[in-house]
Amino acid sequence: MSHPEAPITPEVEADLAIARRGCDELLVESEFARKLARSRATGVPLRIKLGLDPTAPDIHLGHTVVLNKMRQLQDLGHNVIFLIGDFTSTIGDPSGRNSTRPPLTREQIETNAKTYYAQASLVLDPARTEIRYNSEWCDPLGARGMIQLASRYTVARMMEREDFTRRFKGGVPIAVHEFLYPLLQGYDSVALKADLELGGTDQKFNLLVGRELQKEYGQEQQCILTMPLLVGTDGVEKMSKSKGNYIGISEAPESMFGKLMSISDMLMWRYYELLSFRSLADIAALKAEIDGGRNPRDAKVALAQEIVARFHSPQAAEAALAAFEARFRDGAIPEDMPEVTVGGAPQGILRILREAGLVASGSEAQRNVEQGGVRVNGDRVEDKSLQLSAGTYVVQVGKRKFARVKLVG
C-alpha cells in the first residue's frame, strides 16, 4: 500500500529521538521516520500497539519500561492501543521458555485483567488510550479461520525462533499449539492495523511475525520497537516477582522508596534512562554534577521521589523521603560501608550476618538477633529464622557494624 512521501523535518527527527531513547532496537528505523513524517504532514496520528497477557495480577517497574515508551509516544499525539491478550493467555506465550507454559483459565485471566489496566493507567493517559481484547477477533476465527491463518506461515520460519530450536535440539517437546501463539499475536496487528508495535527484547520474533502477516494481508507493515528488560534491585537478574528483586507499582510508598535507594549507583543511571520522565539533557547534567563530586545519593533520592510521586503522589514521596531519612538518622547509618555479595537467595539472616563478616559465628549471630541488635534497612530483626529474598540490603549489627549486602540467587 503506497503513501505519499513527506519530508523528514527537524520536528520528525526530534520525535524519532524520543522513540529511540533507551530502546534496544527500532526496526525498520527509516520506515518509522517516514511514518512519523507522514503523520505530521497529514495530522493523522499513528496507531501504536502494546499487547500484554494478564498472566499475573500485579505490574512491577519492569513492566513500566515499555509503558513509559508508550506514554512518550502518546504525548506526541499518537493513538496508543493497550491490548489485553485474554485469548492468547489461554495458549501461553512460549517466548524464552525451556518447556511448555501452562495456559491460564478464563477465570484467572479475567481476575488478572481487572487490575492490569487500572495499574497501567498510572503511566498511560486513560483519556487517550484505546483498550482492546484480542478475543474480539480471535474467538470468531474458528477452526477454518485458524487453519487459514496457519497457512500464512511456514514451520521453517517458526523454527528460526531460538527457544524453539533449543528445545527441538534438546529433545524437549514443543506442542503444536505453541506455534499458534506468535501467529495470533501477529494477527492482532492485522486486526488493529498497527503502525508500530512495542515489546520487550524477548518479544522480537513475535513482533516480526506481525510485520510478515500484515504484508500477507496487504497492509502496510508495522515497525517494531523493543525495549530492554529492566534489571532488578539485585543488579544481576531481570526484574521478576519470582526472583524477589522487583518493585511493585502498587507497593507502599516507603517500601518503594527504600528499594529504589538500595540499588547500586551504576544501576541508578540505567533506571534513570528507562524509568524517569526527565529529559536526557537533564539526566546528563545531573550525571556531570555527580562526576564532579556531588553525592550520588542526591541523584538516587531524586529518582526515588519521582517514581513514588508518579505511582502515589508528591506528598507520599515527601513523606517516604522523611521516613527514610529519619530511619537512617536515628540509626546513624553511614553512607560509605563495605559491600558484600552473598549467594543462595533466599537466605537466612544468621548466615547472611556470618557471610558479611558482621559476626564471627552462628551463635554470635543468634545472640545479636535475640538481643535486638540486628537491623535490615533500618528495621529491627526480631525473628532469627528471617529469610531474605534476592536484593540489596543495609545490614547493621550493634551501633557500629554495617554492610551493604547484595543477595543473589
From Swiss-Prot:
GO cellular component: cytosol
CDD domains in the record: S4, TyrRS_core
Positions with a binding annotation for ATP: 241
Stretches assigned to coiled coil: none
Gene Ontology MF: a single term: ATP binding
Domain S4 RNA-binding: 347-407
Recorded superkingdom: Bacteria
Residue window of motif 'HIGH' region: 54-63
Enzyme nomenclature, EC number: 6.1.1.1
Primary location group: cytoplasm
Assembly, per entry: Homodimer.
Task performed by this protein: Catalyzes the attachment of tyrosine to tRNA(Tyr) in a two-step reaction: tyrosine is first activated by ATP to form Tyr-AMP and then transferred to the acceptor end of tRNA(Tyr).
Protein's name according to its UniProt entry: Tyrosine--tRNA ligase
Gene assigned in the entry: tyrS
